[in-house]
Regions:
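N-terminal beta-rich core of secreted/periplasmic extracellular enzymes
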Residues: 1-151
């Protein structure tokens, strides 16, 4: 039995389900009323220990501060019962610190090198602040006439 199989065998169903959840970082702070910000956590029976089984955090705010992200990862890792690291994800559709035109605009240039450069810069900047997963590049193939403009 390999390491992954052993880990999955040790994990409860609740822990496995929590790995598929993504939250904002403030749920890990003690000075925030989680129920007023994230909905009915009590009704859903979400406990404090469940937070340290959650798979992904989406730091919409303070995304440029690698120290905040690193501290959050350390706090999570120390309290995760199985030593599973926290994934950090963010929308990096057209850059992180360096902002490029949206993908639709870059495609209008017919310049593949510009497209490659923009995603390469976004990847380097994301990695530098501790982001593991970027929701980009993306292609919204919208065929609904109610959606006149999309990225």
């Amino acid at each position: 039995m390999n390491r992954l199989e052993k880990l999955l065998k040790k994990m409860t169903l609740r822990e496995k389900l929590a790995q598929m959840v993504q939250v904002l970082p403030f749920v890990f702070t003690d000075d925030v009323d989680r129920n007023s910000l994230t909905g009915p956590l009590k009704e859903l029976n979400v406990k404090q220990e469940d937070l340290y089984n959650i798979g992904t955090v989406y730091p919409a705010l303070n995304v440029f501060d690698s120290e905040i992200i690193l501290n959050l990862k350390k706090q999570y890792f120390e309290k995760n019962p199985h030593g599973i690291p926290l994934l950090v994800a963010n929308d990096v559709v057209h850059g992180l610190r360096t902002i490029f035109p949206i993908p639709l605009a870059i495609s209008c240039t017919w310049d593949p090198k510009m497209a490659e450069l923009s995603v390469r810069v976004a990847a380097v900047e994301s990695y530098a602040v501790g982001i593991h997963v970027t929701y980009a590049p993306m292609a919204d193939l919208v065929r609904d006439p109610r959606w006149g403009r999309v990225l």
